[in-house]
């Protein structure tokens, strides 16, 4: 009997492709940190003195100036990308223009790169609140940035701005000392030493630096938006909102338009319709629109085979030890993870319901150390919980790597070539595309 084969080949079959190799071999502690900007570049720090940037569109690496890290490079070293440019803060002004026109900003910075395609946020002064594309810039002291679209009012010496360009925070390992914690600014091609005071005396087991930025994949990620119905010197109110009490603590609110546009504040408390913040420079009113997002001012560090969790305040350049209401059940060990989950798809209503949103509220962390344990930190509630998921028979240890994309965490199990995908909305682990060529050995180092 004649038959017809109606089967069709699978479209978009998962497959692995080789990319350009790092110019030099990796070593224990080598880590990769991805920017969250439109070019999605990756910084690789190979040692205290070697670093490279990878351009995925060109599949190539370029060395950059030495990180100049102190300490003994190895396990525990970590890096993460933040959204703010040199000298910028969340609650105060620091980058002030020296003049300009309706299409140009004369900066107070020495820019070292072509920043076309990136954005600039106007914090105060003429055109406050505007988020503009950079069309071109000069490479010199007091660099001139040309922006689009043209604005109604010329920029001036009262313009306060932020370049929304990559900024990588890098933490070394071994015995910590001055220059163990540094930041690389992409726009100026400079490294700056930051304070390590408040961290442990030494770091020697896997660790993670975690950012909660307002900008994701080249644009602002807002968890709630609206227009104020009233405000005071320390509050913003929108009557009719039905937020859960305290759900926005440690998030940030940005005034996107109207009175007070450009201001950003950390939320210290909230009721069903009221946000409490530090004192506004200009009190918002009924013309003020706002957006709530992740907090650019905080970094978190977990790891070092300890349950202790640290938070870095970028504005103050200080570290503090957090005291969660419920401590983490087990210390993170070799092969641990740490990711802020912010973009579970909109189809998951419980993750995106503004009145009790889950997106942006939690940091998830696999314990590592030969276990399958998964823990979750509540940023607003300052508490840890252990997450039940299935199947949970696979364990993770030295060399396991993780990469977050939207609502899924992709997991490379050490060097053996097996991959898994963890779905946060479903609390479920799935098998994923097997690598055809396992690595020769497990790599100790961070990925972000």
Where are these regions (language model features)?
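Short, surface-exposed beta-strand-loop junctions and turns on beta-sheet-rich folds
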Residues: 60, 153-154, 282-285, 417, ...
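Beta-propeller domains
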Residues: 6, 10-15, 46-57, 61
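Short beta-strand segments
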Residues: 62, 130-132, 192, 263-265, ...
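Conserved short beta-strand element of beta-propeller blades
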Residues: 1, 19-46, 51-53, 64-88, ...
């Amino acid at each position: 009997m004649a038959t017809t084969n109606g089967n069709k080949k699978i479209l978009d079959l998962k497959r692995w492709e080789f990319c350009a190799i790092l110019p030099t071999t990796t070593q224990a502690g080598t880590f990769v940190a991805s920017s969250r900007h439109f070019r999605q570049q990756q910084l690789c720090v190979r040692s205290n003195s070697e670093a490279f940037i990878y351009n995925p569109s060109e599949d190539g690496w370029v060395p950059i100036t030495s990180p100049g890290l102190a300490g003994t490079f190895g396990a525990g070293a970590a890096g993460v990308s933040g959204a703010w440019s040199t000298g910028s803060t969340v609650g105060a002004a620091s980058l002030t223009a020296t003049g300009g026109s309706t299409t140009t900003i004369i900066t107070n910075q020495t820019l070292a790169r072509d920043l076309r395609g990136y954005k600039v946020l106007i914090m105060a002064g003429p055109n406050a609140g505007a988020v503009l594309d950079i069309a071109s810039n000069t490479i010199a002291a007091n660099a001139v940035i040309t922006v689009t679209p043209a604005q109604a009012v010329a920029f001036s010496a009262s313009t306060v701005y932020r370049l929304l360009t990559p900024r990588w925070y890098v933490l070394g390992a071994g015995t910590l000392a001055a220059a163990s914690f540094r930041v690389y600014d992409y726009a100026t091609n400079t490294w700056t030493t930051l304070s390590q005071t408040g961290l442990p005396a030494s770091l020697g087991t896997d660790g993670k630096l975690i950012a909660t930025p307002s900008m994701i994949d080249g644009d602002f990620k807002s968890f709630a938006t609206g227009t104020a119905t009233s405000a005071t010197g320390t509050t913003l109110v929108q009557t009719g909102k039905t937020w859960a009490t305290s759900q926005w603590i440690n998030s940030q609110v940005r005034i996107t338009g109207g009175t007070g546009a450009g201001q950003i504040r950390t939320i210290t408390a909230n009721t069903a319709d009221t946000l409490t913040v530090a004192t506004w420079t200009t009190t918002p009113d009924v013309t003020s629109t706002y957006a709530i997002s992740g907090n650019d001012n905080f970094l978190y560090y977990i790891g070092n085979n300890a349950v202790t969790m640290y938070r870095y305040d970028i504005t103050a350049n200080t570290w503090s030890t957090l005291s969660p209401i419920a401590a983490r059940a087990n210390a993170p060990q070799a092969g641990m993870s740490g990711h802020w989950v912010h973009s579970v798809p909109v189809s998951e209503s419980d993750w995106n319901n503004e009145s009790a949103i889950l997106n942006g509220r939690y940091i998830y962390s696999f314990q590592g150390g030969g276990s399958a344990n998964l823990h979750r930190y509540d940023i607003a509630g300052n508490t840890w919980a252990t997450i039940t998921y299935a199947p949970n028979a696979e364990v993770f240890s030295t060399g396991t790597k993780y990469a977050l994309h939207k609502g899924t965490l992709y997991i490379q199990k050490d060097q053996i070539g097996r991959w898994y995908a963890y779905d946060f909305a479903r609390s479920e682990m799935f098998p994923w595309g097997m690598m055809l060529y396992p690595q020769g050995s497990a790599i100790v180092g961070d990925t972000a």
